[in-house]
Amino acid sequence: MATENVGTVVQIIGPVIDIRFERGKLPSIYNAIKINSEGIDIVAEVMQYTGNDTVRCVSMNSTDGLKRGMKAVDTGEPIKVPVGKEVLGRVFNVLGEPIDGKGDVKATTYLPIHREAPGLDEQKPVTEILETGIKVIDLLAPYAKGGKIGLFGGAGVGKTVLIMELIRNIATEHGGYSVFTGVGERSREGNDLWNEMNESGVIEKTALVFGQMNEPPGSRMRVGLTGLTMAEYFRDELGQDVLLFIDNIFRFIQAGSEVSALLGRIPSAVGYQPTLATEMGALQERITSTKKGSITSVQAVYVPADDLTDPAPATTFTHLDATTVLSRHIVEQGIYPAVDPLDSTSRVLDRRIVGDEHYTVARKVQEILQRYKELQDIIAILGLDELSEEDKLIVFRARKIQRFLSQPFFVAEAYTGYKGKFVRIKDTIRGFKEIIEGKMDDIPEAAFYMAGTIDEVYERAKKM
């Protein structure tokens, strides 16, 4: 057995640790370093060389109690985490250690969290829609199977609830595996999600990885890679179509910014790290469809101060196939999910992929909503009566469309009092087609609110 490469802790600045090794024995960048003495058990990752014999590392755990002079051992490899079916139904931290109190994981395979993205010859273009059962998404900004989707929104507009609904729908309707990665979000939400999944039985097909708000920046920066590594194994070795949820990708950037400052790098625009685009690219390029399987990724993106031009959301935009924008203006109207039908976009809303009928209905719906938006100023100043008959009709149809875009969620039944609905794409298209063709003109607006299919609207209207 080779002798251990042992170093000594020489400096500690918060989560950043400088470790001195013998000359010629410096560990490689990204190697995991273990510090295990005097009741301290820390794993750190090598980030940079600061001299001929010293490496600067970022700790994945709290550095409380760490002292200069403590021994540190180079493991000779990056952080490795368990993969395979054994991780389903369990909760892990960034190091792949179970944190759900259910004992050890019986995994036989462990993989490093730092890996190359699949080569161009292994990748597969995506032209298939993933049916989510959520009307506003399936109609106006459909998700591509194996695509990357961004959920954009400020604080408290419903990003996490939408993610929970997607996990529930994919597990129960498609029977696929999901990996949920909680990056720098509230522990309470993680606990809610865990309890929700146990109650609904979804947990059996999901692995959860958490590096929450109270964790050091090193943990929050790497936890996304831990979840991604588990998802990659399902794709590459088991040939699965996997769903990878990242809540919240902004916190990954934020943690990178903290680490960058601690490492002494000069900040870039708005104080972000100069390596922002590189770090984001390294993570996003691994999320892709290959000839073996696919990873469809849904990433919640917190938008600081609702400013979409901030470098963090702006860098994320470049990697996405679809964007689901959640709007505070729609929340104020009491319409949930608060997806903005005009701001949300998708690369697969294309005649060649979704077909003529879907494309035509979607564009007509957006056209009516856009015209209604333009008319709102006139209505505010002159009143509804000053509009032409044609414009009045557009306003009435637009208001029905807005209400029909709302939908009761399974995971929010306790809050809304409405039973959750999963709506097939064909029913969604049929419903909106009837509204835009004028077949629903004599039905009151209230019948459309929180309805599933158009048939339910007819039933409600009869009782009114």
Curated annotation (Swiss-Prot):
Signal peptide: none annotated. ATP binds at residues 153-160. One of its GO terms (cellular component) is plasma membrane. The keyword Zinc-finger does not apply. Gene3D superfamilies: 2.40.10.170, Bovine Mitochondrial F1-atpase, Atp Synthase Beta Chain, Chain D, domain 3, P-loop containing nucleotide triphosphate hydrolases. Pfam families: ATP-synt_ab, ATP-synt_ab_N, ATP-synt_VA_C. It is found in: Cell membrane. It catalyses: ATP + H2O + 4 H(+)(in) = ADP + phosphate + 5 H(+)(out). GO terms for molecular function: ATP binding; ATP hydrolysis activity; proton-transporting ATP synthase activity, rotational mechanism. It is an enzyme of class 7 (translocase). It is a peripheral membrane protein. Its EC number is 7.1.2.2. Keywords: ATP synthesis, ATP-binding, Cell membrane, CF(1), Hydrogen ion transport, Ion transport, Membrane, Nucleotide-binding, Translocase, Transport. InterPro entries: AAA+_ATPase, ATP-synt_VA_C, ATP_synth_F1_bsu, ATPase_a/bsu_AS, ATPase_alpha/beta_chains, ATPase_F1/V1/A1_a/bsu_N, ATPase_F1/V1/A1_a/bsu_N_sf, ATPase_F1/V1/A1_a/bsu_nucl-bd. F-type ATPases have 2 components, CF(1) - the catalytic core - and CF(0) - the membrane proton channel. CF(1) has five subunits: alpha(3), beta(3), gamma(1), delta(1), epsilon(1). CF(0) has three main subunits: a(1), b(2) and c(9-12). The alpha and beta chains form an alternating ring which encloses part of the gamma chain. CF(1) is attached to CF(0) by a central stalk formed by the gamma and epsilon chains, while a peripheral stalk is formed by the delta and b chains. Belongs to the ATPase alpha/beta chains family. Produces ATP from ADP in the presence of a proton gradient across the membrane. The catalytic sites are hosted primarily by the beta subunits. This is ATP synthase subunit beta. It comes from Acetivibrio thermocellus (strain ATCC 27405 / DSM 1237 / JCM 9322 / NBRC 103400 / NCIMB 10682 / NRRL B-4536 / VPI 7372).
